[in-house]
């Protein structure tokens, strides 16, 4: 009977394909991909929803977007009288159409919607929520995912992504909508009056906040190459740099045009060195010093440096974090009660640097909303000078409550320009940090373990660490094991336990005098990540051996 219902369901969807906005994508998919759309369901989680285009409740299409919008409308109206919302969208396929659908549904429920007439960045959305004092915000993006993906992120009134509790409540309202093919949403001219133009003054205010943060960029002969990887950071980043009187940059023209197919990049992810290939070519031609890339929604940023001999140095997220923290420490030397916030899987290097400079630090679960939560809870006398995640997400000043590559681009240029005046590079500065606090190094291993066997393997690894805590790993003596699922720390050296004041998450962190390793399974994919952050000789060899020991 279940099979018959599934077949009927599929037939109903196919009958509505012409109205779905995604018929073309569906027709390009394999039989397996098509079937997945009917056999799965998109779920609204702590990061909203993200998925492929296609037919069925497991895919993004006109009907599943209407369901999401209707659930969010009911959720918002249950939270407050006369709710307001701002919607931004990136350059991806159907981002504009999804934004209009959501705006129409919300307006139909007497929710005032601010909707721009062009694409915007994710940090601009976070800023706009705060600037316009709206109840919520929606960002339509799938970050650096492939071209056949899109997604919806929902933000609260503080400009941060919804908390876990709020996400769960919104999810219940969405699920209560039921079958998306049965939704009937009449659009009246009276209700479309709730859709307002997005005020240009908000973008101007955002630019002013960054201009005030940067001040000025000192004159040097620093040359920069910038690529938006076909995303949203052009034109805002070039306009921002020019407003700061910095004109010594070249754009990778082919990649600085919005393109939902990401035609000229192998990867639209600044973590991936391949994302810099065309930037490197241009840097070699123009003899540039600094290469910067942002991901498609401009919340994350990667950098590389070219020396006088044409050698390219790529910096990982932890190294960029250390450089930016070092610079912010220099910039804020007059402030008291300084604070840095980072995720629990980010480097020991930044913590050591903070300690050395008498800057307090806090660690939070992965996900920038947890950093935003800490910012929200700060006392008036505390000064948050920097926050970051090792996955290339950084925030210098909290007028935005999400990762913000737009504010970081001029900051890193200012830093590099100052160094250039003294004949130094970012690589030199990183080496100086290592000499000051020790050579803490980091690497990440990501394992995809498919199917039931893969799931069992992941569970077995996590269970083993919980029930049989190791005394040592590759000659490194274990001090403590932090289990974020039980919110407990087991101190092996004292044979005692203590509590972690944190939300629960399926993460285990093993602490040594030399640093830590962390294990973190994905909640949505058949993946598990191993983070290694250590100060030890032969780091690469030790990290490889730890990885082999755990996953052999």
From Swiss-Prot:
The active site is at 143 (phosphoserine intermediate). It holds the Pfam family PGM_PMM_IV. Catalyzes the interconversion between glucose-6-phosphate and alpha-glucose-1-phosphate. This is the first step in the biosynthesis of diglucosyl-diacylglycerol (Glc2-DAG), i.e. the predominant glycolipid found in the S.aureus membrane, which is also used as a membrane anchor for lipoteichoic acid (LTA). Gene3D superfamilies: Alpha-D-Glucose-1,6-Bisphosphate, subunit A, domain 3, Alpha-D-phosphohexomutase, C-terminal domain. It catalyses: alpha-D-glucose 1-phosphate = alpha-D-glucose 6-phosphate. Mg(2+) binds at residues 143, 295, 297, 299. This is Phosphoglucomutase. InterPro entries: A-D-PHexomutase_a/b/a-I, A-D-PHexomutase_a/b/a-I/II/III, A-D-PHexomutase_a/b/a-II, A-D-PHexomutase_a/b/a-III, A-D-PHexomutase_C, A-D-PHexomutase_C_sf, A-D-PHexomutase_CS, Alpha-D-phosphohexomutase_SF. GO terms for molecular function: magnesium ion binding; phosphoglucomutase activity; phosphopentomutase activity. Belongs to the phosphohexose mutase family. The keyword Cell membrane does not apply. It comes from Staphylococcus aureus (strain N315). The keyword Isomerase applies. Its cofactor is Mg(2+). Keywords: Carbohydrate metabolism, Glucose metabolism, Isomerase, Magnesium, Metal-binding, Phosphoprotein. Signal peptide: none annotated. One of its GO terms (biological process) is glucose metabolic process. It comes from the Bacteria. Pathway: Glycolipid metabolism; diglucosyl-diacylglycerol biosynthesis. Binds 1 Mg(2+) ion per subunit. Its EC number is 5.4.2.2. SUPFAM superfamilies: Phosphoglucomutase, C-terminal domain, Phosphoglucomutase, first 3 domains.
């Amino acid at each position: 009977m279940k099979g018959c219902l599934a077949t009927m369901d599929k037939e109903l969807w196919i009958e509505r394909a012409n109205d779905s906005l995604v018929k073309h994508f569906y027709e390009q998919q394999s039989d397996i991909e098509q079937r997945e759309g009917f056999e799965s369901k998109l779920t609204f989680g702590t990061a909203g929803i993200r998925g492929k285009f296609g037919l069925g409740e497991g895919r993004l299409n006109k009907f599943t977007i209407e369901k999401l919008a209707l659930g969010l409308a009911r959720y918002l109206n249950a939270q407050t009288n006369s709710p307001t919302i701002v919607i931004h969208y990136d350059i991806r396929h159907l981002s504009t159409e999804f934004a209009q659908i959501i705006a129409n549904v919300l307006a139909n429920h007497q929710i005032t919607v601010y909707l721009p007439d062009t694409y915007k960045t994710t940090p601009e959305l976070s800023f706009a929520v705060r600037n316009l004092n709206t109840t919520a915000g929606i960002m339509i993006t799938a970050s650096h995912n492939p071209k056949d993906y899109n997604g919806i992120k929902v933000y609260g009134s503080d400009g941060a992504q919804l908390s876990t509790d709020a996400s769960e409540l919104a999810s219940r309202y969405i699920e209560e909508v039921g079958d998306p093919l049965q939704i009937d949403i009449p659009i009246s001219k009276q209700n479309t009056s709730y859709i307002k133009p997005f005020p240009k003054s908000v973008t101007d205010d955002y630019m002013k906040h960054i201009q005030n943060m940067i001040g000025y960029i000192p004159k040097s002969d620093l040359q920069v190459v910038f690529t938006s990887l076909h995303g949203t950071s052009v034109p805002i980043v070039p306009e921002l740099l020019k407003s700061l009187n910095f004109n010594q940059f070249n754009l990778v023209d082919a990649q600085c045009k919005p393109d939902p197919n990401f035609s000229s990049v192998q990867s639209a992810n600044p973590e991936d060195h391949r994302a810099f290939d065309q930037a490197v070519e241009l840097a070699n031609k123009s003899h540039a010093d600094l290469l910067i890339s942002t991901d498609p929604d401009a919340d994350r940023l990667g950098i590389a440096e070219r020396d006088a001999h044409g050698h390219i140095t790529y910096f990982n997220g932890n190294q960029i974090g250390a450089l930016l923290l070092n610079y912010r420490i220099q910039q804020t030397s007059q402030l008291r009660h300084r604070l840095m916030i980072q995720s629990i899987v980010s480097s020991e290097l930044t913590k050591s640097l903070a300690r050395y400079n008498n800057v307090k630090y806090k660690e939070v679960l992965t996900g920038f909303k947890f950093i935003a939560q800490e910012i929200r809870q700060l006392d008036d006398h505390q000064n948050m000078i920097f926050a970051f995640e090792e996955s290339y997400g950084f925030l210098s000043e909290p007028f935005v409550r999400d990762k913000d590559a737009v504010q970081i681009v001029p900051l890193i240029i200012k830093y590099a320009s100052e160094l250039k005046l003294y004949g130094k590079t970012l690589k030199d500065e990183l080496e100086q940090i290592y000499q000051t606090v020790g050579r803490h190094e980091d690497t990440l291993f990501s394992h995809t373990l498919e199917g039931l066997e893969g799931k069992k393997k992941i569970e077995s690894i996590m269970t083993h660490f919980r029930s049989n805590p190791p005394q040592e790993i590759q000659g490194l003596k274990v001090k403590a094991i932090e289990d974020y699922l039980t919110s407990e720390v087991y101190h092996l050296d004292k044979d005692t336990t203590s509590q972690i004041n944190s939300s629960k998450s399926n993460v285990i962190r093993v602490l040594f005098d030399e640093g830590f390793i962390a294990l973190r399974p994905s909640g949505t994919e058949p993946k598990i990540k191993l983070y290694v952050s250590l100060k030890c000789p032969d780091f690469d060899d030790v990290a490889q051996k730890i990885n082999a020991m755990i996953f052999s």
